[in-house]
């Protein structure tokens, strides 16, 4: 395995290996591991990012890699160079791994056809997929609940435009989770792997073991999709009162960025969610992905995991 473009590219053995390596890093049993010493990793983010970019950079540097993040605003793309030509030039410099985020669906898969002798990671492409975030959520749920099979997982928010929802549905349904979607009719879509679609928040969370909230993707939403953010929050914001209808041990998740007061209240986000645990898990998962793509289950013998 030398690319991570979408969830379907992962075998069960890949996922299990990534989980096991993640747990080693998460529990700090490999904090001095410099397995990527001498490797060059290039981050190409054509779309804004806080958590994904920062956690990849931290993972890369923690593992000893030479980490380079191209500033798109000062790159030759602003002089008319195409994205493909940019990739071809970066590839000619012989990096070991390129991590790409783009606002265009399927662009990363297209780019991978032009790249040789280099690993590629999709860090999110349009509304297509965000496989590393799905792996973070999978590892977080498995860490807290031990098993995915037969869990009731409700995903609430802007499903229509969400690459996180698509990747999570594809991954979690493979392991026997019962996936429900909660959204206004204009932001819902029927995806393979989904058991139920609800348009009422309370109905959708009553039996949930996990509630995964998503922001409104205002950069992709047209004005006619929802009347207003205020109307959306009135019907779909998860607050303490609405949360009381869910199971007492329900896990509240959010991939970020959160828009508090819209899809989640301040109290629920800050006191009842595992959002920051997901962020912490994100560094460990991305370390594990870098490790696995470049070395598989093998370890640098001087820095055993």
Swiss-Prot record:
It holds the Pfam family OTCace_N. One of its GO terms (biological process) is 'de novo' pyrimidine nucleobase biosynthetic process. GO terms for molecular function: amino acid binding; aspartate carbamoyltransferase activity. Pathway: Pyrimidine metabolism; UMP biosynthesis via de novo pathway; (S)-dihydroorotate from bicarbonate: step 2/3. It catalyses: carbamoyl phosphate + L-aspartate = N-carbamoyl-L-aspartate + phosphate + H(+). Carbamoyl phosphate binds at residues 51-52, 101, 130, 133, 256-257. Its EC number is 2.1.3.2. Keywords: Pyrimidine biosynthesis, Transferase. GO terms for cellular component: cytosol. L-aspartate binds at residues 79, 163, 215. PANTHER family: ASPARTATE CARBAMOYLTRANSFERASE, ORNITHINE CARBAMOYLTRANSFERASE, MITOCHONDRIAL. NCBIfam families: asp_carb_tr (TIGR00670), PRK00856.1 (NF002032). Heterododecamer (2C3:3R2) of six catalytic PyrB chains organized as two trimers (C3), and six regulatory PyrI chains organized as three dimers (R2). Catalyzes the condensation of carbamoyl phosphate and aspartate to form carbamoyl aspartate and inorganic phosphate, the committed step in the de novo pyrimidine nucleotide biosynthesis pathway. Belongs to the aspartate/ornithine carbamoyltransferase superfamily. ATCase family. This is Aspartate carbamoyltransferase catalytic subunit. The gene is pyrB.
